[in-house]
Amino acid sequence: MFERFGREARRVALEATSVAAGLGSSSVEAEHLLVSLAATDHPAGSALLDAGLDPQELRDAIQRDFERVLDRVGIDVSGVDLSSSCRRTKPRWGASAKQGLERALAEAKGRGDRHIGCEHILLGLLRAEHGTVPRLLAAEGIDRDELTGQL
């Protein structure tokens, strides 16, 4: 699928692996793609910034969400450095990222586009019904439909 990515979309995917590693994740997930998109000069990144989601804020929101999820299942994370708990040299692609990229491919095909661009990736992430990205957006008060309309 990566052969269908445009240049900027490839950069987003590559940067997402760095974001995942920087957050101590053993896998690249949809939320890491979202952070990477927010850091681009592409209109998809601008849409995220206009919605109030800058890359650092997203990283912080991911960390808070992770801690909330652990707390819900009874794991106390106070005093634990979670950023280094799951390090690998290179994170593998996780299910939510793969699903988001599959939806991005469907978006590109549905629009008759030959290549997958950043806008397709963002649309693919916004189409998720469950998972970290919808939780993050809801927690930050972001209307997914409104954000989708900006693309």
What are these regions (language model features)?
Residues 1-151:
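Histone-fold recognition with a strong bias for associated Lys/Arg-rich disordered tails
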